[in-house]
């Protein structure tokens, strides 16, 4: 075995972790030590001892540095956040309703998709429009940055194609053709070598970004695919379908590994947790389900909602789950107990997300408001009012101090 | 409604569901008609910048009605909504004689669209409550409706404001859906 030498240690705030850059032989590599259970009051000395036992790269000489990093992570977690958000800018250059919105990793840029067939790239600090990505012949529905890099943007359209763009120049690198119906979900793999697209044609496809070619078609669902998501390592992808099931696929071979069967209504959302052990699914059958990502077996049903579950997500550490329906709820992914009910929206909630730190939840609703909630208590912290029609989408930046909302009223709003 | 509900309404519908596209120039009364169909308040209606969707039960059908904004700058985007259309309803402001030519032109272009080929079309000669409204027969003649031969069509005079004639039009819709869907 080639000798391994540690080059440097990097912090990852959300979810808490330390990234190791090291050299093995002549190859430069990275790996991460996840500290998902870290709390502000965790015993640092004991934790670092534990890390040293588990990780041969962490030698006595760098222990002091590791202690320092863990303390920085704890400080970050312990920071009191009573940030009040207020409207910073209303962006009105889309001439038809918005669909989805997304930030890049640093939060310096964000993108908006629209019924006006464009995707626009914005500068978050100034609210200036940097590029209008034009070329689709129908609604731009699904959009994404290739985070953490952020140098590419993918757009999926009702015109059945997907396009890959340069963030820097706004030029289109590739148009991916092959789906026979609307593309409604997409995602880059974490390595940013592949793009996955899900379509109303009941298939998902994997595309090679470099070559601009189709790599695999994930064939197996009997109805529309409306959600897809890679796991953290990028070797698995899940597809949620209106056929009531979720497919778990091997990315390398395109083979179907498991079909998660149990929901009695269309799937609305599906996601892996950070350590790739669990999958959460939301359904029109008014429930969420937890599954083992490894075996595909059903672990628990999170019941309690009286209406369709329209969105579901894990927090960054993968320890809690937020669900959106007529009201929103927070569940502990370990105990499966409901921790909090987020009540107050006057119409259905269509999107829900945690801030990266996990102490705060953002919801977007048909009642024209977005709301912020304390993730632990369920108290409403703030109501973001101003949109004049339903809010379709919302997002936090990585720092958690900026929010964007996209609405049917044709506008996007930036909140600081 | 939410984006997900829109996707659900986008897919090819089961037998008992009908996708209806409501088009016409700005200020023709499409949104008023939509709200009248859904028995909603019609006192505060503003120009539609995007679209509105409502589902109404009628004669055993679930009618999913898509009301699309008609302003000139967003008419090129009507095409976004053509997929899976079962019935086209075209609304005309019968009192806006200055724009009969414009509305006739837009209708003719719609009837030429490949994705709408063969789709039954109901033309509502709306705003019959106004004294200056042209009768349906005059509009039919002005728009050369009798030359439509590639689909079934009907013109129905109505007032979306009072509701008069609206139900007659919808009866025609249900009748023509049933022949197509069953």
Curated annotation (Swiss-Prot), chain B:
Positions bound to GTP: 24-31, 67-71, 126-129
Pfam families associated with the record: Arf
Molecular function, one GO term: GTP binding
InterPro entries given in the database record: ARL2/3 (IPR044612), P-loop_NTPase (IPR027417), Small_GTP-bd (IPR005225), Small_GTPase_ARF/SAR (IPR006689)
Annotated keywords: Cell cycle, Cell division, Cell projection, Cytoplasm, Cytoskeleton, Golgi apparatus, GTP-binding, Lipoprotein, Membrane, Myristate, Nucleotide-binding, Nucleus, Protein transport, Transport
Subcellular location: Golgi apparatus membrane; Cytoplasm, Cytoskeleton, Spindle; Nucleus; Cytoplasm, Cytoskeleton, Microtubule organizing center, Centrosome
Predominant subcellular localization, coarse grouping: Golgi
Superkingdom classification of source: Eukaryota
Lipidated sites in chain (N-myristoyl glycine): 2
Gene Ontology, cellular component aspect: axoneme; centrosome; ciliary basal body; cilium; cytoplasmic microtubule; Golgi apparatus; Golgi membrane; midbody
GO BP annotations listed: cilium assembly; Golgi to plasma membrane transport; intraciliary transport; kidney development; mitotic cytokinesis; photoreceptor cell development; protein localization to ciliary membrane; protein transport
Membrane topology summary: Peripheral membrane protein
The protein's role, per its UniProt record: Small GTP-binding protein which cycles between an inactive GDP-bound and an active GTP-bound form, and the rate of cycling is regulated by guanine nucleotide exchange factors (GEF) and GTPase-activating proteins (GAP). Required for normal cytokinesis and cilia signaling. Required for targeting proteins to the ciliary membrane by releasing myristoylated protein from unc119 cargo adapters into the cilium.
PANTHER family: ADP-RIBOSYLATION FACTOR-LIKE PROTEIN 2-RELATED
Family: Belongs to the small GTPase superfamily. Arf family.
Protein name (database record): ADP-ribosylation factor-like protein 3
Species assigned in the record: Taeniopygia guttata (Zebra finch)
Gene giving rise to this polypeptide: ARL3
